[in-house]
């Protein structure tokens, strides 16, 4: 009887994992077929921008494809940005941290982000709303360079020109800006080196951000409410994969 019991326990474990993986399904609006933004081979759907080198000029290979995933060195500030603008969509992407941290954020909490509804000229950083990716705070909102959002507490936050303001994720504990930091109250990231699932629902001017199946933040009256999507290089090595966008059904 030991073998069947062992298989039964294993099955329960797999079912538990599936429950976690699909925990947000009831929160996701009906959507169409996926648009694969990254196919594991190249950056067909993206441009690159680096603060020191400009558009589509990456001499130091800050962005690359390694074993079917995107490698971001983090050594220069910049981003991968979609060539196309989007509105009303469900975005899925996975990320994991590498090891390196670099000036001006050497030794600080590893930092990146997905900026969406991006409008205006290419620069560091353009008008947008950000799905923050940072050790101890993944899921925060940042409103950048005129980007604006009304947070879950009903307070509207507008990012001043040339800078940004934050709305902490729901249930966030105290934060410390050091490499490797983890939220002692409600950490949403998996342990360092493991893949994390990020999900974004942008429906009209309403946005929801999920980290590993849990609602991390929610906002309304987003400005802008459409635009390009970018993935940051901001002083920390990390990897992205499985980037897919699903248009919401009308």
PLM-predicted stretches and their roles:
Residues 10-21:
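Bacterial N-terminal signal peptides
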